[in-house]
Design a protein with these regions (language model features):
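Sec-dependent signal peptide recognition
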Residues: 2-8
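Hydrophobic h-region of N-terminal signal peptides that target proteins for export
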Residues: 10-18
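Acidic, metal/ion-coordinating pockets
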Residues: 19-288, 336-351, 359-361, 391, ...
């Protein structure tokens, strides 16, 4: 009797669970580092590979997704190997090794010239999907290509149906923000692009999802405009979040694979979606590193370090010992509030420029998304500021200075949020040298060169042609002793002086 009952229960379980199918998406976004962060505690693509393999053991219909921003910026990518700048080769190599399936563009994929981006696309063993980003060649637009084959606007994933039922088909598209406009790129409207793709697929798919690289408000609008989307796997903000708009789930993990999302979609025998469960997984020391991927990561780190030595850096040299103090370079800090790391960089710029009234720069220049503590090396400074960049001495009217400050402070969460040194916020207004800013007075400021390009978010007006600019002094590139030629050397020099003075 007991044996019959057990057999009946087994059959019952099989009949219930055998009629469902599951599709899994493993999502990363904004991954700039291939190795673990915070002294090895978090992140690391060798650990992500371990998670991928574990999930695939239980479900072969597992797809690994990266929602944009990975080729750039990266500290390792700024180094040289085989007489060429690495330019993202290291991360494509490692992403190939972990078994990545699909990506869409992020705005930082366009940090490089077209030829470099094309090389990285061709190097990829995974597929790129984009509905709204096209190649622009003197006004003629057409798809980017991967080894001569046009990048698709969408892919249709096919999963076998239960028994003799038709297969389950999921349409997936990619959408990228137009935040880094380059002459070789054309951007179409996000929402109409997604609608166009859905109109092409609606009669041939069961479900529609998106890989996006938009700000969260745009993701929410996308969900409202295209309610057929069941899942939007997003990026760009660097901080994990989970939202629902109607029946659409929007999810973003933390940058640099500090966390990843695992989305499990369960369907019944009629291909009806029964459940969508999203699990945010911390990638930390408890997860073993895949040995083959770890070897590859270590090889690229060694190659990059040699390139840094050739540029005059000493990656392993200690600059300062913070002991138990911490410099917080996390995006949720540097892009939202004035912080010690921003103050330090501003102070170093102020010191290097000599004789200026204040210093300021865009928080997006800080890319480390990590906390620094203990012994800080030159490589840590490179990680903080992988773009490097020059320091300009800018003479500008007080009216323009106030506009810059107000623009920067009006966009917390953006790379255009400014960090500063020598500026004071009071109830009466902004002060420089203990006096309220006079709109008619001319001030001298140490300014990051990128901020003066007009390319930072909402700073299109800040160029050399602005009437509020009186004079711009650029560093002499032939003067190797001028720290203004590379803000990283300015920061290293400033920290070393501070450490020596305070150690006595």
């Amino acid at each position: 009797m007991i044996k019959r009952l057990i057999a009946f229960l087994i059959l019952l379980v099989c009949s219930v669970y055998g009629q469902t199918s599951e599709v899994v998406f493993i999502q990363m976004n904004d991954v700039y580092e291939i190795a673990p962060l915070e002294g090895g505690k978090y992140g690391g693509l060798a650990r992500v590979k371990t998670v991928i393999d574990k999930v695939k053991q239980t479900n072969p219909y597992t797809y690994v997704i990266l929602s944009g921003d990975f080729i750039s910026p990266s500290a390792l990518g700024t180094s040289t190997y085989e007489d060429k700048r690495i330019n993202g080769r290291q991360i494509i190599d490692v992403l190939n090794a972990i078994g990545l399936d699909y990506v869409t563009f992020g705005n930082h994929e366009f940090d490089y010239k077209y030829e470099v981006l094309q090389d990285r696309i061709n190097q990829s063993q995974f597929e790129w999907i984009s509905s709204n980003v096209k190649r622009n060649d003197n006004g003629t637009t057409f798809p980017f290509n991967q080894n001569g084959i046009d990048l698709p606007e969408y892919k249709v994933l096919t999963v076998p149906g239960y028994l003799k039922n038709p297969p389950l088909k999921i349409g997936i598209t990619g959408i990228c923000i137009d935040a880094n406009k380059q002459s070789y790129v054309s951007y179409a409207d996000y929402y109409s692009s997604a609608k166009d793709v859905y109109s092409k697929l609606r009669d041939s798919i069961n479900y529609f999802i998106a890989i996006s690289h938009l700000v969260i408000d745009e993701d929410k609008k996308l969900a409202s405009e295209v309610p057929q989307l069941k899942l939007i796997m997003g990026g760009h903000e660097h901080v994990n979040m989970y939202h629902r708009v109607g029946e659409t789930v929007i999810a973003k993990a933390d940058a640099n694979a500090v966390t990843i999302y695992i989305h499990r979609l369960t369907f019944d025998e009629n291909n009806k979606l029964l459940d969508l469960k999203s699990e945010l997984v911390s990638i930390n020391e408890k997860i073993a590193e895949d040995p083959k991927v770890k070897v590859l990561v270590d090889e690229w780190v060694t190659r990059a370090y040699k390139g840094f030595y050739d540029k005059g850096f000493d990656p392993l040299k200690m600059v300062i010992d913070l002991k138990k103090d911490t410099l917080d370079g996390k995006d949720e800090t540097v892009r939202y509030t004035q912080c010690a790391l921003g103050y330090l960089i501003g102070n170093a710029m102020f010191d290097a420029a000599k004789g200026v009234d204040l210093a300021f720069f865009n928080s997006g220049a800080i890319r480390i998304d990590d906390k620094l503590t203990g012994e800080i090396t030159e490589y840590d400074i490179i990680r903080v500021l992988p773009f490097g960049g020059r320091i300009f001495k800018v003479e500008l009217k007080g009216s323009l200075l106030k506009q810059i400050i107000e623009t920067g402070f009006s966009q917390p969460g953006s790379g255009g949020y400014i960090q500063y040194y020598g500026l004071e916020q009071t109830a009466a207004g902004y002060k420089v040298k203990n006096e309220l800013i006079d709109e008619e007075k001319v001030y001298s400021a140490a300014v990051a060169d990128y901020l003066m390009s007009g390319m930072e978010s909402n700073f299109g007006y800040l160029t050399k042609d602005n009437p509020g600019i009186v004079k711009i002094t650029e560093p002499n590139p032939n003067d190797k002793d001028d720290l203004c030629n590379d803000v990283r050397f300015a920061v290293i020099n400033f920290l070393e002086k501070w450490f020596i003075q305070n150690r006595k």
